[in-house]
Amino acid sequence: MTPFEEILAVRAAEAGLALTAAQIEQFAVYNRLLIAWNERMNLTALTAPEDVAVKHIIDSLTAYDAKLFAPARTLIDVGTGAGLPGIPLAVYAPKIEVTLMDALGKRVKFLTEAAAAMELRNVRCIHARAEEAARRPEHRARYDIAVSRAVARLPVLLAYTLPFVRTGGTLLALKGRAYAAEQAEGKRAAEILGGGAISARPVRLPGLDDVRAILAVTKERPTPKGYPRRTGLPERAPLK
């Protein structure tokens, strides 16, 4: 094993994650490509082996919930950036078809190369803005699960993501230590966009003291036709 693979194996075990040797090898491929591409473009500020293993990969996998993922068939990662949390979830839940969506073409090129090198046959990469893609019939209300990490505060994030989720599906937002404030802020937006109550599942990462959380919103009814609003408006004028 390489030093990165050893760190990942140890930290994953500490987090209660059962990674296979093949999955660890896939993540090693991702790590190598992330480091190489990061020299050409700004994908992440965190490139040390411990940081990639814990703050990127294991953090992404905290979104996994067996009861939710077992029956799911489709997942979209909105504003995926460097493929987080979508790529780790695609590795860990290979039966789910994962769509990685990002507005920056260069990042989509990285994602496409990474998915191919990791032999992730359950991943497709799309270059699009969420506000525009969510109005297309092939994406609107088509996904069992939507995930997002480090994109926007919850009222804005809900506007970007809930239109993609089918009725009965779930949005999972990976949030930091201020998650309780965002949970309260997002209540009205969730109601407007067809979501139910916002639940919080606190999580801890191995080796770190801070508490994070997965905020979950179940889609209870269709998102009104007027949403998402035109490009840029969800962020400039969040729903309150």
Predicted regions and their residues:
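Class I SAM-dependent transferase core
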Residues: 1-76, 106-123, 231
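Short loop/edge segments at beta-strand edges and connector loops
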Residues: 21, 47, 127-129, 199-201
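Conserved SAM/SAH cofactor-binding pocket of Class I
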Residues: 58-152, 158-161
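Conserved beta-strand segments of alpha/beta enzyme cores
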Residues: 97, 122-124, 170, 196-199
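Short strand-turn motif at the edge of the Rossmann-like AdoMet-binding core
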Residues: 103, 151, 174-178, 202
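Short alpha-helix immediately C-terminal to the canonical SAM-binding loop
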Residues: 107-109, 179, 183
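Short glycine-dipeptide loop
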Residues: 165-172
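SAM/dcSAM-binding transferase cores
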Residues: 184-240
